[in-house]
């Protein structure tokens, strides 16, 4: 199977899932949108669920890449973290409010996106993490896990996107200020 064909199918699936939702999209719809026959589609993917998961993973990977590219222009971990949470959480939650299809895509595959985002946050924290602390103390990995794990609770209590942004920014500031400078 060529990666080009697989990408074409995943892009077609992603467009259709975001437009119509999982239940209203058939394998025939995906094959037609990808410009291939239905039997050819089944040679690449066993079922619609596999395409759905693949389309979500592709979307997450693209979003992570976008954040990484934009973060390259920023000079502090705090700015990179604020950017990551703005693009990877706040804008996503805003878009999910108006798109039940996007909400379905994210919620059905939340674990993958959460792990990828947590890894991104950890990469932004690693260069500034304290190196002289005991193993059981704050690490970039633990701080990233705390930040990402706190977001669902913040989402539940925040009344507006601005409230959510403020809670996330406060948590970022709290973690960064708790680390001694080398």
Regions found by a protein language model. Name each.
Residues 1-3, 182:
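N-terminal intrinsically disordered/low-complexity leader segments
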Residues 8, 12, 16, 20-50, ...:
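Helix-turn-helix
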Residues 19-23, 74, 95:
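Short coil/turn segments at alpha/beta junctions that flank glycine-rich nucleotide-binding fingerprints
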Residues 54, 67-94, 144-147:
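Hydrophobic alpha-helical connector segments
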Residues 57-64:
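Short, basic, alpha-helical segments at the C-terminal edge of helix-turn-helix-like DNA-binding modules
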Residues 61, 109-145:
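Amphipathic alpha-helical packing segments from all-alpha helical-bundle domains
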Residues 79-115, 156:
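Amphipathic alpha-helical segments used for helix-helix packing
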Residues 99-104, 132-175, 182:
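Hydrophobic/aromatic-rich alpha-helical bundle segments in the mid-to-C-terminal region
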């Amino acid at each position: 199977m060529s990666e080009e064909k697989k990408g074409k199918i995943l892009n077609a699936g992603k467009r259709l899932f975001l437009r119509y939702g999982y239940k209203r999209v058939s394998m025939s719809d995906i094959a037609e949108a990808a410009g291939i026959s239905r039997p050819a589609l089944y040679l690449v993917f066993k079922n619609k669920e596999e395409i759905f998961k693949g389309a979500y993973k592709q979307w997450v990977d693209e979003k992570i890449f976008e954040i990484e590219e934009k973060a390259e222009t920023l000079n502090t971990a705090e700015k990179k973290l604020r950017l990551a949470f703005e693009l990877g959480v706040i804008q996503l939650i805003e878009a999910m409010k108006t798109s039940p299809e996007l909400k379905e895509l994210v919620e059905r595959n939340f674990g993958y996106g959460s792990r990828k985002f947590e890894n991104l946050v950890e990469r932004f924290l690693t260069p500034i993490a304290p190196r002289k602390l005991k193993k059981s103390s704050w690490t970039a990995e633990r701080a990233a896990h705390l930040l990402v794990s706190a977001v669902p609770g913040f989402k539940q209590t925040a009344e507006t996107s601005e409230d959510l942004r403020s809670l996330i920014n406060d948590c970022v500031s709290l973690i960064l200020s708790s680390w001694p400078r080398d």
